[in-house]
Amino acid sequence: MKAVIQRVLNASVSVDDKIVSAIQQGYCILLGVGSDDTPEDVTKLSNKILKLKLFDNAEQPWKSTIADIQGEILCVSQFTLHARVNKGAKPDFHRSMKGPEAIELYEQVVKTLGESLGSDKIKKGVFGAMMNVQLVNNGPVTILYDTKE
């Protein structure tokens, strides 16, 4: 699994010009499910997201987790994270998991995060839809994480 984890002041996702989800301070996560991902990757990614200290506390930077600040998460599926562009100009998506299997793992990540933070703290995009994602990146702080590395 690959994730782009962005610390945001706010973020939203729209489909057909209608906002379907929005959050305030927290993370906007673009999540790509790879063809070789398993439930173990769900656990590894979820644990990493929950343990990351990307927020400041009163005394020092990089000391607080998403739970510490009572932040929210907007999790958006993005199969293009596994695209290869080494040969030619057209992206190769063969390393991305197919929709029916990928949605199960994506939903497991959302569920796992919700169980830890509270389901009201987790919002998501529409799996497989063409979406517009808007965000105010705070810092900017953007972390790339791959469960296979």
From Swiss-Prot:
Motif Gly-cisPro motif, important for rejection of L-amino acids in this chain: 139-140
Catalytic activity: glycyl-tRNA(Ala) + H2O = tRNA(Ala) + glycine + H(+); a D-aminoacyl-tRNA + H2O = a tRNA + a D-alpha-amino acid + H(+)
tRNA-binding recorded as keyword: yes
Location in the cell: Cytoplasm
A GO MF term: tRNA binding
Catalytic EC class: hydrolase
Keywords tagged on the record: Cytoplasm, Hydrolase, RNA-binding, tRNA-binding
CDD domains: Dtyr_deacylase
GO CC, alphabetical: cytoplasm; cytosol; nucleus
Pfam family, one: Tyr_Deacylase
E.C. numbers: 3.1.1.96
Keyword Hydrolase on entry: yes
Gene Ontology terms describing biological process: cytoplasmic translation; tRNA metabolic process
Subunit structure: Homodimer.
Family: Belongs to the DTD family.
Comment on protein domains: A Gly-cisPro motif from one monomer fits into the active site of the other monomer to allow specific chiral rejection of L-amino acids.
Function summary: An aminoacyl-tRNA editing enzyme that deacylates mischarged D-aminoacyl-tRNAs. Also deacylates mischarged glycyl-tRNA(Ala), protecting cells against glycine mischarging by AlaRS. Acts via tRNA-based rather than protein-based catalysis; rejects L-amino acids rather than detecting D-amino acids in the active site. By recycling D-aminoacyl-tRNA to D-amino acids and free tRNA molecules, this enzyme counteracts the toxicity associated with the formation of D-aminoacyl-tRNA entities in vivo and helps enforce protein L-homochirality.
Protein name: D-aminoacyl-tRNA deacylase
The organism of origin for this protein: Schizosaccharomyces pombe (strain 972 / ATCC 24843)
Lineage start: Eukaryota, Fungi, Dikarya, Ascomycota, Taphrinomycotina
Name of the coding gene: dtd1
